[in-house]
């Protein structure tokens, strides 16, 4: 439950603006000043840490939910039931260190990436249309796994005009070794309308020559 709540909170950047503060000051209406210190020591002593919260009770003992972001990847470490305060921070630090050393966020594809190939168009104002990816894909992978990735594109032999930009015309399968791990739409990069009257007339003449 703590992990699920932490992951949801991490989606809201405003939270990290406050949770990442190590020291802050409150000025009361009376003018009295209260100094605040973040109980999450990792905010100060762990690079990239910007949340979340500590807690302790007699039953739960010392606990912490900590998060850090590096190289575009955010990790969350939840530690419960430690015998003393420092151990919860040590355990959380070890978990974060392991995660950042072992995994990486990889941008496999970006929306709008051109495929470098075209698809034949029947009875259109152009004979073919360029293709691009209709969506992007980022994944968390173990370090070194990128060499096992490949993308296979499945397309029909041709499509009929009219074709509109963004129209789905095929599928790109992302494979890790031989296992499909994701599917992306392949879309038309531009419009291919039906030929106009004059162009259509000349095409008919060409067919009869």
Predicted regions and their residues:
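Domain-terminus/edge residues, biased toward the C-terminal soluble/receptor-binding domains
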Residues: 1-209
């Amino acid at each position: 439950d703590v992990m699920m709540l932490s992951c949801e909170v991490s989606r809201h950047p405003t939270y990290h603006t406050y949770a990442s503060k190590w020291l802050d000051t409150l000025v009361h209406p009376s003018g009295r000043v209260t100094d605040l210190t973040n109980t999450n020591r990792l905010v100060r002593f762990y690079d990239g840490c910007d949340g979340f919260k500590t807690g302790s009770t007699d039953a739960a003992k010392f606990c912490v939910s900590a998060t850090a972001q590096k190289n575009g990847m955010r990790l969350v470490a939840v530690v419960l039931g430690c015998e003393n305060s420092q151990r919860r921070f040590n355990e959380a630090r070890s978990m974060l260190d392991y995660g950042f050393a072992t995994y990486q966020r990889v941008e496999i594809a970006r929306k709008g990436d051109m495929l470098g190939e075209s698809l034949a168009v029947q009875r259109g104002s152009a004979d073919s249309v360029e293709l691009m990816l209709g969506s992007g894909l980022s994944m968390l992978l173990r370090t070194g796994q990128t060499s096992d990735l490949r993308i296979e594109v499945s397309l029909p032999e041709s499509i009929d005009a009219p074709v509109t930009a963004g129209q789905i015309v095929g599928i790109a399968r992302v494979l890790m070794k031989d296992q499909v791990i994701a599917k992306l739409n392949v879309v038309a990069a531009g419009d291919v309308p039906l030929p106009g009257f004059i162009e259509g007339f000349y095409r008919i003449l060409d067919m009869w020559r």
